[in-house]
């Protein structure tokens, strides 16, 4: 007897907001997530992320930290302070890897903190 390992999971009801100022990172994540059937919304800066999160109400936000004008920590604080977006889970994807960065990520509302394996 063999097991069927080609199980397809339908993620099409879930929307993920990808936020990064590096366009190639956004495109890579968008391709990977859409291949898994997620709906993907993108933003290239913190201000757009706040607008997209409020308008689209994603199920998850993948958020870069190092962005110009408004960094990911500031975005997270604003999202968590807004009743419309405060319950959206946030995962930080970043090149930052110090203990203080990780602690700060959790303090400002991040659920997880992952280091980018890509640039």
Spans of model-derived segments:
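Non-catalytic signal-transmission and effector/linker regions of two-component phosphorelay proteins
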Residues: 1-15, 30
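Receiver (REC) domain active-site loop signature in two-component systems and cognate sites
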Residues: 67
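Active-site residues of response regulator receiver
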Residues: 20, 64, 94
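Two-component/phosphorelay signaling modules centered on CheY-like receiver
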Residues: 23-41, 55
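Acidic, metal-coordinating helix/loop segments flanking the phosphotransfer/catalytic sites
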Residues: 4, 17, 42-60
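His-Asp phosphorelay/catalytic-motif detector in bacterial-type signaling
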Residues: 12-13, 57-59, 84-89
């Amino acid at each position: 007897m063999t097991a069927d390992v080609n199980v397809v999971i339908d993620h099409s009801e879930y929307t993920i907001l990808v936020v990064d100022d590096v366009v190639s990172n956004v495109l890579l994540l968008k391709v990977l997530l859409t291949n898994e059937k997620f709906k993907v919304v993108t933003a290239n800066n913190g201000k757009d992320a706040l607008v997209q999160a409020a308008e689209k109400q994603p199920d998850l936000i993948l958020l870069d930290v190092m962005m110009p004008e408004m960094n990911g920590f500031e975005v997270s604080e604003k999202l968590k302070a807004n009743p419309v977006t405060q319950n959206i889970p946030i995962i930080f994807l970043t090149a930052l890897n110090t203990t203080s960065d990780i602690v700060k990520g959790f303090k400002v509302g991040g659920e997880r903190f992952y280091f980018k394996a890509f640039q």
